[in-house]
Amino acid sequence: MTSAANKRSIMTLFSDKTDIYCHQVRIVLAEKGVAYETEVVDPQVVSEDLMELNPYGTLPTLVDRDLVLFNSRIIMEYLDERFPHPPLMPVYPVARGKSRLLMLRIEQDWYPVLAKAEKGTDAERAVALKQLREEILAIAPIFTQMPYFMSEEFSLVDCYIAPLLWRMQELGVDFSGAGSKAIKAYMARVFERDSFMQSLGVSAPKNLMDEK
């Protein structure tokens, strides 16, 4: 593992463009303004390089000189500590604990439902997207309280929920009715950030706030 990592003089991210966990890490790297190289990996054909670095062959995998990290949460928290500006986690332990719990709940409650929408049958997709839409609309008041998700500043929690909302939009979900204005405002605010656009490599949508 060490010899393979030492061959790389610049930080390298092994990534799949469609993977939501890789997307999280790309947002953080863009927020931090970190120079890095991307090794695009087909998750169905894991390269020998990746297997030498990461015995699980999972994505994302980050190589920073002789350090190899996998698991998006570990990578993102490392990047936040390694490059402290701008900070993406609260300063105080209680607030940090709450942020970690929010990330865990988003990952455990919503990511599996999104996976059903992306990989399931048409019927399973419809059911999964309906569930996601209804559950997010149910917490719409949260989006009115602060500019970002339960925070005055953009944070790692946003790096969890923004890729989810982006994929829902790509799958045709439209938020309408009670609470939708606040959700659309949040989506526009996050999707128009330079870091989010860089994470996609394309322009963010400009029509989210058309319906007011």
Swiss-Prot record:
Top-rank taxon: Bacteria
All copies of domain GST N-terminal, residue ranges: 9-87
Domain GST C-terminal: 92-212
GO cellular component: cytoplasm
Matching InterPro entries: Glutathione-S-Trfase_C-like (IPR010987), Glutathione-S-Trfase_C_sf (IPR036282), Glutathione_S-Trfase (IPR040079), Glutathione_S-Trfase_N (IPR004045), GST_C (IPR004046), GST_Omega/HSP26 (IPR050983), SspA_C (IPR034342), SspA_N (IPR034341)
NCBIfam families in UniProt: PRK09481.1
Protein name from the UniProt record: Stringent starvation protein A homolog
Lineage: Bacteria, Pseudomonadati, Pseudomonadota, Gammaproteobacteria, Pasteurellales
